[in-house]
Every structure is written in structure tokens, then in C-alpha cells.
């Protein structure tokens, strides 16, 4: 059994996607970030970076003591290795999956903490800041659009943890469901993200 420390954000959705698609048993442990639950000592013992998601796997492969993990990319990789699912087994395919997983982990802060914050949540709307992060977000959407023009999924022919990491951020954005920014970012122009 896996305990999933979760709140319904794009990063939280990544891990629930894996758990649901793999059919793994888990218990949802809400971490209400609006009320500051991420700063409580019990949660910090599992996720010292005070960010969710985090998991505790009470039945790790090979048995042994429970394993606690934080950071969505690390969790996805752990679950893929534990189950043998949603990651290529050959070296080249695995490298491709990890490349796109790490691309998302490095790029999403510009989308969420940058564009999303200043466009949707900042108390003062600063045009320069919004435009700067919008330009970077559109560059990232273009990277994905070009990749999906040549590949069924971001890491090749198969659905992987890279897709699970990317969709909650970029898929929702491309559908106009994140930050209400679809028209502003002209997401309809990224045809391969619309499929």
C-alpha cells in the first residue's frame, strides 16, 4: 500500500495518474497547501522541501522498511522502476524518457511559478513580467508541439512517465484549462498539443 500526500495541483496529478493507470492501491492523504499543511512537522518528515506530492511505500520491492519519497519526478521514476511500467527497458529508450521527464522538471517552474503566478495570482499585474514568462511558456509549448509532430508520445511510440509529468502542466494549458490563459497564449496554434 502507498500513502500519497496530495493536493489537486499539476504536480499532484502526475503521481495520481501513474497510480491509477498502473492499478496500484493507495491511500490519499490530503495536504491542504492553502491552509499551510505542507509546513506541519509530520509532513516535513516525509517531504523536507515542504512541497507535495510525496509518498510512503509500505510495500517496497524486495520488502524491507517503508520508503518515503518527495519530488514528483523522483516518485514517477521510483514507481516505474518498481512496477516495470511506463518506462523503456532499453538504454536508448530509457534515456529518451528521462530526457523528457527532466525537461519537464526543469521547465515547469517557468510555467507555474513564473507565468501562472504573475498572470493569474499576483496582486499586481506587471505587463513586463507577464510578457516575459508568456514568451518562455510559448517557447516551451513550441518545443512540445514540434516533438509531437514527429512522435506519438513525447518519448517515442509508447506512453511513459514523461507524458504523465508533462500533461498536467502543458496538456491542461493547451486545452485552455490552466490559468484561463488559452486565448492569451494562443494555444490553438499548437496543433499537435490539441490531439
Q: Residues of each region from the PLM?
A:
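Extended, well-ordered alpha-helical scaffold segments
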Residues: 132-136, 184-195
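Amphipathic alpha-helical interaction segments
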Residues: 74, 96-99, 163-164, 168, ...
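GST-like domain detector, emphasizing the conserved glutathione-binding G-site
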Residues: 1-138, 145, 152
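GST superfamily/GST-like fold recognition
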Residues: 107, 111-116, 154-191
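Amphipathic alpha-helical core segments of compact helical bundles
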Residues: 80, 102, 149, 166-174
Amino acid at each position: 500500500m502507498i500513502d500519497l500526500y496530495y493536493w489537486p495541483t499539476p504536480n499532484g496529478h502526475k503521481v495520481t495518474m501513474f497510480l491509477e493507470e498502473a492499478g496500484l492501491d493507495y491511500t490519499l492523504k490530503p495536504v491542504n497547501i492553502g491552509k499551510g499543511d505542507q509546513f506541519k512537522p509530520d509532513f516535513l518528515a516525509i517531504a523536507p522541501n515542504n512541497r507535495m506530492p510525496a509518498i510512503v511505500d509500505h510495500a517496497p520491492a524486495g520488502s524491507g522498511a517503508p520508503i518515503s519519497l518527495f519530488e514528483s519526478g523522483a516518485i514517477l521514476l521510483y514507481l516505474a522502476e518498481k512496477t516495470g511500467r511506463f518506462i523503456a527497458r532499453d538504454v536508448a529508450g530509457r534515456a529518451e524518457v528521462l530526457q523528457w521527464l527532466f525537461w519537464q522538471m526543469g521547465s515547469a517552474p517557468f510555467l507555474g511559478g513564473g507565468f501562472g503566478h504573475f498572470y493569474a495570482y499576483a496582486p499586481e499585474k506587471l505587463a513586463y513580467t507577464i510578457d516575459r514568462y508568456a514568451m518562455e511558456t510559448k517557447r516551451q509549448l513550441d518545443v512540445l508541439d514540434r516533438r509531437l509532430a514527429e512522435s506519438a508520445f513525447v518519448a517515442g511510440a509508447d506512453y511513459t512517465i514523461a507524458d504523465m509529468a508533462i500533461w498536467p502542466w502543458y496538456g491542461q494549458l493547451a486545452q485552455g484549462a490552466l490559468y484561463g490563459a488559452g486565448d492569451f497564449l494562443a494555444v490553438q496554434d499548437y496543433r499537435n498539443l490539441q490531439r
